């Protein structure tokens, strides 16, 4: 008799805990949405729009032209909009240092690992190895 009541209370408590989860983490919210169940809500947003007008070949292929670091993804203080460093143009030393302080440690680690892999991978289209 008490087991179903306990399970019901436990389920309600679990639902309350899930509803208090911070939305900055990009959680998927299917069950508490007013939209149909096929719709999935996430808190991540992408900056979609026309690219800046000063893009050049050197900007598109920074690792091929100058063997610079891979674009590192970092988030602003509230983790709302992901931004990419090094994708839209070269930075001077002061700007790069300020932005690298905001890079998450795991992101920096994966960026360095991917950079090592890219430098040892031949590119069949260009016929050169980085």
Swiss-Prot record:
<feature type="signal peptide">
    <location>
        <begin position="1"/>
        <end position="19"/>
    </location>
</feature>
<dbReference type="GO" id="GO:0005576">
    <property type="term" value="C:extracellular region"/>
</dbReference>
<keyword id="KW-0964">Secreted</keyword>
<keyword id="KW-0732">Signal</keyword>
<protein>
    <recommendedName>
        <fullName>Uncharacterized protein encoded by LINC03122</fullName>
    </recommendedName>
</protein>
